[in-house]
Amino acid sequence: MDASTLFKKVKVKRVLGSLEQQIDDITTDSRTAREGSIFVASVGYTVDSHKFCQNVADQGCKLVVVNKEQSLPANVTQVVVPDTLRVASILAHTLYDYPSHQLVTFGVTGTNGKTSIATMIHLIQRKLQKNSAYLGTNGFQINETKTKGANTTPETVSLTKKIKEAVDAGAESMTLEVSSHGLVLGRLRGVEFDVAIFSNLTQDHLDFHGTMEAYGHAKSLLFSQLGEDLSKEKYVVLNNDDSFSEYLRTVTPYEVFSYGIDEEAQFMAKNIQESLQGVSFDFVTPFGTYPVKSPYVGKFNISNIMAAMIAVWSKGTSLETIIKAVENLEPVEGRLEVLDPSLPIDLIIDYAHTADGMNKLIDAVQPFVKQKLIFLVGMAGERDLTKTPEMGRVACRADYVIFTPDNPANDDPKMLTAELAKGATHQNYIEFDDRAEGIKHAIDIAEPGDTVVLASKGREPYQIMPGHIKVPHRDDLIGLEAAYKKFGGGPVDQ
């Protein structure tokens, strides 16, 4: 596409050079800029990428978007704008032909449950033989092909490229995990959503948002800004068991479908039965009551299942068809995932990293603990420490607790575990500044019949260490290796 055409919708301060050049790529990553690319520089929290403009020029890039004029060769066109990232969104959606308009787009937000609900929607679509894509904490997936990702919600250009990739692969729908960071930072500008789903709101990310009010406002942006295509039917799915849903009703102009277990809602779960093999319940709807069975464990997953079913139903699939699909869904990686049921202990990994998430996790597993519940939890570095003692208190619902760091980054691991220990309500806990050693200790003290829960990371494949270096780490692999060494079995499948 000709650059002059691309910039027709952009208000610029000035253009230094010519826009008469062909463009086939947009990037905010200086390492990928080349001839035919537009490089969009920005001032980030830690890095100002304007300093890489000379690098991209050396790589053959002939057009940069900047917030102030740079010292560059005369053959490099500079487009000076007030807000480079807002312009990046406009350019990306224009160049890639507004990809979110070309499929059904589901957006899932909330403190806990985003990954589970988003994955369930994707898996239901696949059971219905529909081409589907997913993007979130567990990476990027088109049908069954997976690649890893860095952020729950990528920056705006990368996000648009992923949606375009899904469209080109024939995806009929795409489900996005929508983070509060992504909403505030404008990463979702220009994305056309068809259905927005809310799970819950509890304390998290106050290191970024400052207050719960600001955090809640960030979440609400999804529901007030579903897009500009008024010809499409759009819906909002809210959890009535969370009081924040009342506020979300006031900010959205779209039709709302509510679900709940404890509070009255349009769609409800009654007569709940739970086991470590899954859940069953009566799904009470405006159209009748349906029996539902699912392999997912825990009462909180019933809420997630309802949210996913309603979202898919809202776009025209019958509930009977969806319920049949739900019976045979694959596990959501790293979410209340039981590792190797042949072991004499129940070894479980989960992503729960807030007090609310941990409470729900313990509620789910405690009824099925045969002997002791051993619970390992970590606290992330450079994050909101005000929530940490409460996490420690909740963890002490278990018989024995292990406190570790989780992505300590530049914080002292001993400080992080000490913050968790401030909330301890009994003395049956131990602190490890090395998470891997903490996991090995959990297995070492476990006896047949015990339940070992490794919380806060799920299948996250790294630890963020000093200097923000990512070191390979997998809770599931470390736990299984230690369990096979003690109890026999294996080998660990890498």
Swiss-Prot record:
Positions of modified residues (N6-carboxylysine): K219
Post-translational modification: Carboxylation is probably crucial for Mg(2+) binding and, consequently, for the gamma-phosphate positioning of ATP.
Biological process per Gene Ontology, one example term: cell wall organization
Principal subcellular localization: cytoplasm
Reactions catalysed, as given in the entry: UDP-N-acetyl-alpha-D-muramoyl-L-alanyl-D-glutamate + L-lysine + ATP = UDP-N-acetyl-alpha-D-muramoyl-L-alanyl-gamma-D-glutamyl-L-lysine + ADP + phosphate + H(+)
Localization per Swiss-Prot or TrEMBL: Cytoplasm
Swiss-Prot/TrEMBL keywords: ATP-binding, Cell cycle, Cell division, Cell shape, Cell wall biogenesis/degradation, Cytoplasm, Ligase, Nucleotide-binding, Peptidoglycan synthesis
InterPro entries from the UniProt entry: Mur-like_cat_sf (IPR036565), Mur_ligase_C (IPR004101), Mur_ligase_C_dom_sf (IPR036615), Mur_ligase_cen (IPR013221), MurE/MurF_N (IPR035911), UDP-N-AcMur-Glu-dNH2Pim_ligase (IPR005761)
Family: Belongs to the MurCDEF family. MurE subfamily.
Name listed for the protein in its UniProt record: UDP-N-acetylmuramoyl-L-alanyl-D-glutamate--L-lysine ligase
Organism expressing this protein natively: Staphylococcus aureus (strain Mu3 / ATCC 700698)
Lineage start: Bacteria, Bacillati, Bacillota, Bacilli, Bacillales
Gene that this sequence comes from: murE
